UniProtKB/Swiss-Prot annotation:
Name of the protein in its database record: RNA pyrophosphohydrolase
Any one GO BP annotation for this protein: nucleoside phosphate metabolic process
Cofactor(s) this protein cannot do without: a divalent metal cation
Source organism (scientific name): Wolbachia sp. subsp. Brugia malayi (strain TRS)
Main enzyme class: hydrolase
Gene (UniProt): rppH
Short name of any one Pfam family annotated for the protein: NUDIX
GO terms, molecular function: bis(5'-adenosyl)-pentaphosphatase activity; guanosine-3',5'-bis(diphosphate) 3'-diphosphatase activity
Motif Nudix box, residue range(s) on this chain: 40-61
Function statement: Accelerates the degradation of transcripts by removing pyrophosphate from the 5'-end of triphosphorylated RNA, leading to a more labile monophosphorylated state that can stimulate subsequent ribonuclease cleavage.
Gene3D superfamilies recorded: Nucleoside Triphosphate Pyrophosphohydrolase (3.90.79.10)
Family as reported in the entry's similarity comment: Belongs to the Nudix hydrolase family. RppH subfamily.
UniProt keyword terms in alphabetical order: Hydrolase
Cysteines joined through disulfide linkages: none
Amino acid sequence: MVEQKDKYRPCVGIMLFNKQGHVFIGKRFDSDSYWQMPQGGIDDGEKLEQAALRELLEEVGTDKAKIIAKNKDWIYYNLPEEVIPTCWNGRYSGQKQRWFLMKFYGEGKDININYTDHPEFKEWRWQSVDNLVAGAIPFKKEVYKTVIEEFSSQIKVSIIK
């Protein structure tokens, strides 16, 4: 596939894991079926790390996390054709993402998905890495497989520490 890089919305994704090695996922308000890891756009002039920490606070409602790693390259995905007109006014055909692995060092009470006036998620839970892809929306499954492949060994090492 030839990628039109200007047609992809730049954003960050966050794989937030707890001390048991489980990953935070949320169920979006616009879906009853799919769960996803936090992600969001990068503001003008914002560094990737800043965007990731801001998105963590906005979507998960916590700052009780430490960045462990960042994936090597942009990961691209395309939206289904029927979804493009309804997302970002049809400006993008998909997203390009840089992913951050973050270790959560807080407790359950330190997560507040209603932190903003317009929350992203209606529910959340900790999920085993092995079951992340199964609950993801179909057009993001390959992204999740790539992120898991890149970060899974670092999660195991970080649990031990």
